[in-house]
């Protein structure tokens, strides 16, 4: 067991006025001492321990990973367990004392590097939903389908942010993250029910770093930026969160991208569409259908490829794909040009070993307030996506 001890020397300065009256340092905040990190090569868990200040007024602890990920704990503790720390990279943890009047002490920092070889080999799939997923009819219906087809058959695990440590590369090949919520604000940091917490995001990062794959649907496509697969500047910009309304049109996905000669990208035979009905007569081109008449939320969370300043030649789809090492597999059912990316397959890279399949089309909807005549197509598509990532 490796132990890293850090001892800080406090330097006290005494200031006196002309009248020899001591000036009390009323803002002094005693720091923690004796910070230790216990860990072992080949394992991901780390235990931090320290000695708390002796002065009165301490109300909690602040732990900072790599000078950016902050965890505030509203109780006085002297140890903290990290089940899945970053591996094969330099990482730092800083511990600070928090006080009831709002003061935060200077921190002690420990730095470590864990050598770890992922034992990838699982073939199960996990589904991650918000702790409060029952607040969404769409999320509830998706979970019910996943339970019946994967959990109950021993092929899957349902997890939430409160059980995120159950996500395990030795057990799971892929993880489906689903969030479809009325009223949620734009931006991944606003995802509900713990999906945007440091613990959740770090667990997804670690899973992908070990070669695990993600299926991100609906509002969860924003996690492409959270986990670092794309820059924040390229996060999904087409966004909807309203209550929606009755709509009798058939909605789905257009897998043929573009209309310029020599620049038409036909993905209609891709594995994610295997076995589905390619339906003609509804729009200019045939589409794969997801939903019929019903109450549609219109919750897009996808990419406007004209909004990022991409090179227009030969087209913005090609520019996006080259920049992000991805493939645009689908757009809105009525679109025949290059404007938008509704389904994007982000291929593994040297820096990001996991594959991410992002489905941000509003038509990918699990509850439309009644019977969906194309529910079998939606379910087949979802199963295909999961199989593609396994």
Model regions: which residues?
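C-terminal motif of bacterial Sec signal peptides marking the signal peptidase cleavage site
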Residues: 14-17
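Pro/Thr/Ser/Gly-rich low-complexity, intrinsically disordered linker/stalk tracts
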Residues: 19-57, 87, 102-119
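Extracellular ligand-binding/catalytic regions of CAZymes and related secreted enzymes
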Residues: 20-27, 117-118, 239, 246, ...
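Solvent-exposed loop/turn segments flanking beta-strands in beta-repeat/beta-sandwich domains
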Residues: 53-67
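Short beta-strand segments within Ig-like beta-sandwich modules, predominantly Fibronectin type-III
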Residues: 71-77
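Beta-strand-rich modules
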Residues: 82-105
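Helical hinge/lid and interdomain linker segments adjacent to catalytic or ligand-binding clefts
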Residues: 124-237
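An acidic, glycine-rich "communication" segment
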Residues: 216-336
């Amino acid at each position: 067991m490796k132990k890293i001890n850090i001892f800080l020397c406090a330097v006290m300065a005494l200031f006196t006025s002309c009248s020899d009256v001591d000036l009390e340092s009323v803002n002094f905040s005693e720091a923690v001492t004796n910070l230790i990190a216990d860990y072992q090569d080949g394992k991901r868990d780390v235990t931090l321990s320290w000695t708390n200040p002796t002065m009165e007024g301490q109300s909690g602890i602040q732990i900072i990973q790599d000078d950016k990920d902050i965890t505030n704990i509203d109780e006085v503790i002297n140890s903290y367990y990290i089940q899945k720390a970053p591996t094969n990279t330099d990482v730092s943890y800083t511990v600070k004392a928090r006080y009831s009047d709002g003061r935060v002490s200077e921190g002690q920092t420990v730095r470590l590097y864990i050598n770890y070889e992922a034992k990838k080999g699982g073939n199960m799939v996990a589904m991650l939903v918000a702790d409060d997923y029952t607040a969404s009819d769409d999320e509830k219906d998706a979970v019910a389908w996943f339970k019946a087809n994967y959990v109950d058959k021993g092929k899957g695990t349902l997890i939430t942010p409160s059980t995120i440590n159950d996500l395990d590369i030795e057990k799971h090949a892929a993880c489906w993250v689903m969030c479809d919520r009325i009223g949620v604000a734009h931006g991944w940091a606003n995802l509900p029910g713990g999906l945007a917490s440091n613990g959740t995001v770090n667990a997804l990062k670690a899973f992908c770093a070990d070669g695990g794959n993600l299926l991100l649907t609906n509002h969860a496509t924003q996690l492409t930026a959270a986990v670092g697969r794309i820059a924040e500047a390229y996060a999904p910009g087409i966004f909807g969160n309203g209550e929606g309304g009755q709509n009798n049109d058939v909605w789905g996905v257009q897998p043929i991208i573009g209309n310029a000669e020599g620049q038409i990208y036909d993905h209609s035979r891709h594995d994610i569409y295997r076995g589905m009905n390619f339906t003609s007569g509804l729009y200019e081109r045939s589409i794969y259908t997801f939903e019929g008449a019903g109450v549609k939320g219109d919750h897009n969370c996808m990419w406007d490829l004209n909004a990022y300043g991409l090179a227009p030649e030969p087209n913005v789809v090609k520019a996006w794909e080259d920049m992000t090492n991805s493939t645009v597999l689908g757009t809105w059912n009525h679109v025949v040009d290059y404007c938008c990316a509704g389904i994007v397959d982000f291929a593994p890279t040297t820096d990001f070993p996991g594959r991410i399949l992002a489905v941000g089309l509003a038509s990918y909807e699990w509850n439309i307030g009644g019977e969906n005549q194309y529910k079998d197509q939606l379910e087949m598509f979802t199963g295909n996506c999961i199989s593609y990532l396994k």
